[in-house]
UniProtKB/Swiss-Prot annotation:
Organism: Haliotis asinina
Gene Ontology MF: a single term: serine-type endopeptidase inhibitor activity
PANTHER family the record matches: BPTI_KUNITZ INHIBITOR DOMAIN-CONTAINING PROTEIN (PTHR10083:SF374), KUNITZ-TYPE PROTEASE INHIBITOR-RELATED (PTHR10083)
Role noted for this protein: Serine protease inhibitor.
Domain BPTI/Kunitz inhibitor, chain residue ranges per copy: 14-64, 70-120
UniProt protein name: BPTI/Kunitz domain-containing protein
Keyword Repeat set for record: yes
Compartments, record wording: Secreted
Tissues/organs with expression: Component of the acid-soluble and acid-insoluble organic matrix of calcified shell layers (at protein level).
Amino acid sequence: LFVGLTSAKYHDVCQLPRDPGPCRAYIPLYYFNSRTCLCEKFVYGGCQGNANRFDTVEDCRRRCGGGDLCSLPRDSGPCEAAIPRWWYNKRTNRCQRFTYGGCEGNANNFKTLDECRFQCRKRSTY
């Protein structure tokens, strides 16, 4: 159970709010804004804060996505849990089941089919 909680917390790093921490250093970093689904710049104070901070925009996008999370590849992550999840396959334009390992991975990872469909539904003009 403890490992599961740790993995779940690590997976949710992209959902954490921007947190510069209480210190007053000036360290420009990036965080994932879960409302806009974009990696954005912020100034980290140098201590405390949370794990939603990345040295480069590329690191942020690799971990959390950026802009179009539905275009990210399926990524089970390196851990070995067997958690049923859904991912959006842009090639087939469908949400598909996959087995999530419980840590890391990317933002194209949904708990339910409905959540996947809601996030990645096609924007049609008809």
